[in-house]
A protein has these predicted regions:
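Conserved short strand/loop->alpha-helix "switch" segment adjacent to the catalytic nucleotide/phosphoryl-transfer site
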Residues: 5-15, 46, 93-118, 124, ...
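Conserved ATP-binding N-box helix of the HATPase_c
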Residues: 14-43, 107-133, 172-179
Length: 204
């Protein structure tokens, strides 16, 4: 009997991510529902409000991560759910994401979410990320007070350079490169004054 996994490591990792996120979303959602019920029974307090906000944020981030890091196929995800995932992930943070929400195939949504994560990595002081998805292309435009492009992850993403020293905080670069390659696509990066663009074109 062979010990070789039936799936390649990245495909296996996406299944693990999907499973973990799926199994955590329900109990965290139940915590949020319980807090909402509790708030209706007792006087409002900052502590309860903070707990409820934290539960909502955790649930939204899990939904975002399930799309970004999970398994993907031709399943179509509705615009409302995708918009909630994006807004929940970055609500009240240093990154503002603008996107005219539309339904997307899960594999397209995964590419888009990973592109947003890559853009976030290049905006250490925060900024605005504008996303457009149309005509077989995903275009991301970002601007902020400061941009920073670490050579390792960006060279891997755009030129396919080896990136053996990848950390957990940079794994989205590896995944975006790999998932784009599955579509025979290569992300392109262009820099301008105060901002930059990441583009994936040729989606079928």
């Amino acid at each position: 009997m062979s010990d070789t996994p039936a799936k390649d490591p990245i495909a296996l990792a996406t299944l693990v991510s999907s499973r973990v996120c799926h199994d955590l979303i329900s109990p965290i959602g139940a915590v949020g529902n319980g807090l909402e019920l509790l708030q209706s029974l007792i006087p409002p307090s900052p502590e309860l409000a903070l707990l409820a906000e934290s539960a909502d944020t955790a649930s939204a981030k899990l939904r975002f991560f399930r799309v970004a890091f999970g398994a993907a196929g031709e399943e179509v995800l509705d615009a409302r759910g995708l918009a909630q995932g994006l807004s929940g992930m970055y609500a009240g943070g240093r990154i503002n994401v603008e996107w005219e929400a539309t339904a997307l195939r899960r594999r397209e949504a995964r590419l888009m979410f990973l592109m947003v994560l890559c853009a976030e990595s290049a905006l250490p002081l925060g900024g605005t990320v504008h996303v457009e998805v149309d005509e077989g292309a995903i275009r991301l435009y970002a601007e902020g007070r400061r941009t920073r492009f670490e050579p390792g992850p960006w060279a891997h993403l755009c030129q396919g350079e080896p990136f053996a020293e990848c950390s957990s905080a940079q794994v989205h670069f590896l995944l975006l490169r790999a998932f784009a390659a599955e579509e025979t696509l290569t992300p392109t990066l262009s820099e301008g004054e105060g901002g930059f663009a990441i583009v994936l074109s040729g989606l079928m």
